[in-house]
Amino acid sequence: MTIFTKERKLLLAVESSCDETSVAVIEDGDKILSNIVASQIKSHQRFGGVVPEVASRHHVEQVTICIEEALTEAKVTPEELSGVAVTYGPGLVGALLIGLSAAKAFAWAHQLPLIPVNHMAGHIYAARFVAPLEFPLMALLVSGGHTELVYMKEDGSFEIVGETRDDAAGEAYDKVGRVLGLPYPSGKEIDALAHEGTDTYQFPRAMLKEDNYDFSFSGLKSAFINTVHNAEQRGEALSTKDLAASFQASVVEVLVTKTIRACQEYPVKQLLIAGGVAANQGLREAMRHAISEQLPAVTLLIPPLKLCGDNAAMIGAAAFIEAEKNHFASYNLNAEPGVSFMTISEEG
């Protein structure tokens, strides 16, 4: 049974897992008609990170406006839609509930099916807007909350072959940025500084030679903090550019080395980089070089910058796959802030 019985295959998608309220209208799973993103970064900057209560309040204020703007920009009426997609996890529980409530209300009001989408699957399927996915593939998922290597044999099949044992890569960037006195979020600033500095400090590359695909960034974070604090105690001024370059060199080398190694062991046609840290130019450049040198037969897919961060377009792309597999939800669908990949295919 298919829900796509109307003239056009159109879905409304809602994303509210963290600090971006986003609503999109997607056609055919790979065409963005609108992708409205209401960012809250300025509200969280003074706290140096996302405050869940503040995030939830912003979602309440923005979600209805975003729905109206998404439909208007797409020139689509509710009657033309075939379903409503919504992120149900992972994320901040309060933030997720706002998006879920809005999506349920809209779906109920217009008698449309509700499609549950795993936020992390959404990041992977953002690559559908670049090119069709070819299986098997490997996805390096790097964000503020996750660092994972995910192997996919087919649509909707996710096998985590490696993950961080402590801090996520994006989390390490933000903590290092705080030490350097950079505004939140710090990833873009550190990336820019790194391109002007050199790897002077040779920070540790954790687990680089271990026979697995797991990551660890807590040791790097500690080494960085100790280097800065020790210099301060000696009254020594360190180069912010060199510190940023040294930190980024460590993160990127570990991510690239482990990813290439995983792609050499698992048969893959494509490598995807997804998540907020996929916007990092240093990582993009290093991965492109490594792929061309070591795995020329593998195609590298990286979403455009505007689709690396949280957005509803990626949720819509993933929702088309869920709909094809008849994965729909009732109005009892609840937020699952800690949901993993392994449960996505079990959604009924």
UniProtKB/Swiss-Prot annotation:
Binds 1 Fe(2+) ion per subunit. Its cofactor is Fe(2+). GO terms for cellular component: cytoplasm. It is found in: Cytoplasm. Its EC number is 2.3.1.234. It catalyses: L-threonylcarbamoyladenylate + adenosine(37) in tRNA = N(6)-L-threonylcarbamoyladenosine(37) in tRNA + AMP + H(+). It comes from the Bacteria. Belongs to the KAE1 / TsaD family. InterPro entries: ATPase_NBD, Gcp-like_dom, KAE1/TsaD, Peptidase_M22_CS, TsaD. Required for the formation of a threonylcarbamoyl group on adenosine at position 37 (t(6)A37) in tRNAs that read codons beginning with adenine. Is involved in the transfer of the threonylcarbamoyl moiety of threonylcarbamoyl-AMP (TC-AMP) to the N6 group of A37, together with TsaE and TsaB. TsaD likely plays a direct catalytic role in this reaction. One of its GO terms (biological process) is tRNA threonylcarbamoyladenosine modification. It is an enzyme of class 2 (transferase). Substrate binds at residues 141-145, 174, 187, 191, 280. Keywords: Acyltransferase, Cytoplasm, Iron, Metal-binding, Transferase, tRNA processing. One of its GO terms (molecular function) is iron ion binding. This is tRNA N6-adenosine threonylcarbamoyltransferase. It comes from Enterococcus faecalis (strain ATCC 700802 / V583). SUPFAM superfamilies: Actin-like ATPase domain. Its main location: cytoplasm. Fe cation binds at residues 119, 123, 310.
